[in-house]
Amino acid sequence: MDIEKLLAANPAMTDIHLTEGLPLMIRVYGALKKMKEIAEPQLFAELISSYVPPDRQAAYQRTGSADSAFSLGNVRCRLHLYRSGGLASAAIRILPELSLLGADLDRTWLEKVSQLSHGLVLITGSSGSGKSTTMARILSLISQKRACHVVTLEDPVEYVIPMEKALIHQREIGRDVADFPQGIRDALREDPDVIALGEMRDSETISAALTAAETGHLVLGTLHTTRAKDVPARIIHAFPGDRQEEIRGLLAANLVTVSSQMLYRSGKETWLLREILTNVAAVAHLIREGKEEQIPSYMEMGLSQMRTMKQAMYAMKGISERERERLLKSLE
């Protein structure tokens, strides 16, 4: 299998799926397409030897799954190896170079985030919604414009951020540090200005991230939630009841903004939909008082760049009314 040749023949390809003994499948414009080539056992051996570090090879043998990332020219690829029915399988996500992607229509929001000196910024959405790309855009802006120290914690490192004005250390879980909480504790001893977390998976990581934000650092993180309004509750309820009041206070004081996004595909067109929550004084009060259900009413007012997903949908350009109606139903 030659990934570069596959990309040349299918420039819109976003994913490659491999199952031992079966034809390759690629995802193009959101749909899977069967190829003629068969995924032979040797292909998996080559993937593992070429792109998976020894420690992760051992993890694959022990647990049946492993993650890695690698570069092919201007393209980064994220590799997930797993077994299914006793057969070797793999999913490869194509991460195109940021400069080759179209402009993000929320450039103003991205630039404001990149200029923040402290606080917690969350990027949320389902798998494949572009969270990593949004994070990379923000980090690239920081690198271009700020003489600061950025520490990222990723599993694995996806986009490699060029060092321009900023000093950047991209640490990979398993390779460079044991886990996210340990990485945050380490980062606080590394004189960071910005800490970026590939994923906030558990209460220990969330707690460490809030502490880092409270101590004067800019913390960027991602969460698997689909709507911005649900983020405060998602974070608070990750903790036992006796800590929730404390976490409410920390979140209300340190959260700056949330971007929740989704990709909508129709034919060969793809739209990024993003709703934005800004932690203005009224929103912080709602979080502190446990009244998160009232947050959408403030988002709908459009203050401080806030908007709901429905408002983002109505602002979409180049989409037919039929498509808009179909998208509206998917949001309900």
Could you describe each region identified by the protein language model?
Residues 1-332:
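Short, flexible helix-loop junctions that flank or precede catalytic/ligand sites
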